Regions:
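Structural signature of tandem alpha-helical TPR/SEL1-like repeats
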Residues: 67-72, 103-112, 139-148, 174-198, ...
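Hydrophobic face of amphipathic alpha-helices that form TPR/SEL1-like repeat modules
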Residues: 57-63, 91-98, 127-134, 165-176, ...
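TPR/TPR-like (Sel1-like) alpha-helical repeat modules
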Residues: 150, 298-316, 341-345
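N-terminal leader/linker segments that initiate helical-solenoid repeat arrays
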Residues: 20-83, 87-90
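Eukaryotic tandem repeat interaction scaffolds
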Residues: 196, 203-282
Length: 347
């Protein structure tokens, strides 16, 4: 009996051990099963090191920016800028300058432009160089500013050609004031020639400011180059097509006068009308004269007066149009005032 009890005890212990082993196996399986439902998994591989963008890479922050999602653009740019991405630093500086999503802060913009510029980002080099040259938000250092601007020119930034040309003209004018004489006049003439060269390069890349600046130099001529109104008009066309306001106003006058090419009253009228409807007072004055004289449109004194009244609201006056107003009777003036109200933009 005792022998049988011992055998049962041994068998029971063996069964318990087997049960424990099976239970342990089941526990491991259960643990694996539960782990498979855990949505927060432990990372199997370490996080990849941050890689700044290269030229041509897709830029999520800039994509947000051009779509108008400025806060998202700011956050994404800040995340990358803090990790020393020069493209993100440049965009962040731009956002601070424009006040998109955050208050305008020129000092912070200068800080980020500086960081990006020192890493060789061409757009930042231009903007930081201009800040240094003018002393805006940073201590003025024209020599260092010129170096950064020249670097952006060498990198092919199209806007940089205009600024570098203007920089040369500025330096020559300053030298003329401090050291008047034949030598300074000679250097000024040389600076104009050099500025024209840089402006023409910028114009060839489609920069409106460079095209307009080159047009002005060509319309006057230089010491070594006679005035060239035909090519000046072509450059005005380039600038005007790129929405350069002054170029559009100048081109309209040239089209009326026939400078640099044939007269085109109809085109001049529509150029001025486009800007006048956007409340550009000089365009309103010029358009008033076209209505008064019947150039490019049917003569209409009432409409001429209406456009001039709008220009007067912007504190601009023209003696010849004042005489026109004085020659109108009360009925005509009332009609002109009503037409002027109709011309106001609706927001």
């Amino acid at each position: 009996m005792i022998k049988r009890s011992v055998q049962l005890l041994i068998l029971g212990m063996i069964g318990l051990a087997s049960s424990v082993l099976n239970s342990a196996g089941n526990t491991d399986e259960l643990s694996d099963f539960e782990h498979s439902f855990n949505t927060i998994q432990e990372s199997s591989t370490p996080e990849e090191p941050f890689q700044p963008l290269k030229a041509g890479d897709y830029d999520q922050a800039y994509d947000y920016y051009i779509q108008g999602y400025y806060l998202k653009a700011f956050r994404e740019a800040l995340r990358r800028a803090e990790k020393n991405d020069p493209f993100a630093q440049t965009l962040l500086a731009r956002i601070y300058m424009e006040g998109c999503a955050v208050p305008v802060d020129g000092a912070r913009a200068a800080l980020w432009f500086e960081r990006a510029a020192k890493q060789g980002e061409p757009q930042a080099q231009l903007r930081y160089g201009l800040m240094l040259f003018d002393g805006n938000f940073v201590k003025q250092n024209q020599e260092l500013g010129e170096q950064f601007i020249r670097k952006s020119v060498n990198a092919g930034v199209k806007e940089a050609y205009f600024y570098y040309g203007q920089l040369l003209l500025y330096k020559a004018s300053q030298e003329k004031q401090t050291l008047p004489g034949v030598s300074s006049q000679s250097r000024e003439n040389e600076a104009i020639e050099q500025a024209l060269k840089w402006h023409l390069k910028g114009a060839a890349l489609g920069d409106a400011e460079a095209a307009f600046a080159a047009a002005k130099i060509l319309s006057l001529g230089t010491l070594n180059r006679p005035k060239d109104e035909r090519n000046a008009r072509k450059l005005l066309e380039v600038a005007a097509q790129n929405n350069h306001l002054k170029a559009q106003l100048h081109l309209a006058q040239w089209l009326i006068q026939g400078r640099g090419g044939e007269k085109d009253f109809d085109r001049a009228f529509h150029l001025l009308l486009h800007n006048a409807t956007h409340m550009v007072a000089p365009a309103q004055i010029s358009l008033a004269r076209l209505y008064r004289d019947g150039i490019g449109t049917k003569g209409d004194t009432i409409m001429a007066a209406a456009w001039y009244l709008l220009a007067k609201e912007a504190k601009m006056q023209a003696p010849d149009l004042e005489i026109m107003l004085q020659g109108m009777d009360n009925t005509q003036r009332e009609k002109a005032q009503k037409e002027a109200i109709k011309l106001l933009p609706v927001f």
